[in-house]
Amino acid sequence: MNLFPETVATDDKVSQLFKTSNALDKKATPLIKVQKIEVIKKTDKDADGDEKMEDAASDDAKVKKPSKKKLAKKNKETKTPEQVPEEPEKLVEEGKESKKSTKEDEIEKASRTIFVGNLSNEVIISKSTYKLFQKLFNNIDDDDENKKLPIQSIRFRSVSFEDALPRKVAFVQQKLHKSRASVNAYIVYKEQSPLLNKLIKRLNGQVFSNRHLRVDSITHPAPHDKQRSVFVGNLDFEEDEESLWKHFGACGSIEYVRIVRDPKTNMGKGFAYVQFNELQSVSKALLLNEKPMISQNEHLKKRKLRVTRCKNIRKVEPTLKSGKYMTDGQKTKLGRAKKILNKAERSKLLKELTVEGIRATKDDSKPVLKKGKKERSKTGRVTKRSQAFKKSQQKK
């Protein structure tokens, strides 16, 4: 019995139409044979049997699939000693040692680094100015050119840019801000030399590219002497150091001028410090209080400055846990480590603070401050009364 009689009839009509058409060849396309489909109805018994077979197959699959823990144990047993990786504890210790070594290198690097402030931004723009700057800090003496200190690297910081671009892109494109004409630099020398202090003293306050340089050491910066310095307030945020050099230059020789700036925007905060070489210059500088200052920047208006003495706030000198005062070498390591190390490492630093060339003593580990109650004096009034009371109680 044919299940699809209509499909066969339609196929015959289509074949006759294509035979008469001119587009196709005379050969007719063969007819597709239609397979017979037999529909078998399953009884309830057959359905129950199929369900049982599926349940049995699923049970077999559950039994055959091993757990992840068993697979992991088998893999461990089959691994040869060559395939077993190294212990993670050793790798962590090696990582800690490498971090310590890099941080110690940074502390050692700071001892041969000097800071140069109020530097003209022409050093970044002009190659000839950069070469002159490099030559200035290479030579120890102006008379003897053979005495040189080799420079390892020069880094420029506090550079203000005009556009909001990435700093590297703006630096390459030389898009510097017009109102900020000075930058800071860090010069790293290849070797640590005692002649660096001589170089710092000679170049501090020297004029380079129409600006007074401020040269100082990183590890042992020059102390801020409150008696030889004055506080200057009511400054414009865009004020420059050269304006203060010119304004206070008549009072006496100036050691350095420092305008306090915002670390992110490099704009001034409205106040500065001027330190003189002589104490008598401070009294002359105080006479300039409430007097207007002519700015080097032409677009800035005259402002009346507030000139006062610096407050003499005493700072407690750092000491070790043994109570002893630290040496210059220990202060160097502690001062730089505060910026390089994190909070946990800084807390351990005083325990492990060692400097090469210093011999350890027996009393280094003994703390001066003892915990608990204070010991009673043996010859005091309280002890005498207590001893007399005990004797009177024994007689009774």
Swiss-Prot record:
Q: Where does the RRM domain lie?
A: 112-220, 228-312
* Gene Ontology biological process: maturation of LSU-rRNA from tricistronic rRNA transcript (SSU-rRNA, 5.8S rRNA, LSU-rRNA)
Against SUPFAM superfamilies, the record matches this protein to: RNA-binding domain, RBD
Its annotated function is as follows: Involved in pre-25S rRNA processing.
Q: Which Gene Ontology cellular component terms are annotated?
A: nucleolus; preribosome
Basic and acidic residues composition-biased segments? 87-104
Q: Which GO terms describe its molecular function?
A: rRNA binding
From what superkingdom does this record's organism come? Answer: Eukaryota
Supply the alphabetized keyword list: Nucleus, Repeat, Ribosome biogenesis, RNA-binding, rRNA processing
Q: Does the keyword Transport apply?
A: no
Please state what the protein is called: Nucleolar protein 12
**What Pfam families does the record tag this protein with?**
RRM_1
Instruction: Tell me the segments the record calls region Disordered.
Output: 43-104, 361-396
| Basic residues: bias regions | 64-73, 368-396
Question: Transmembrane segments in this chain: where?
Answer: none
Compositionally biased intervals (Acidic residues): 47-58
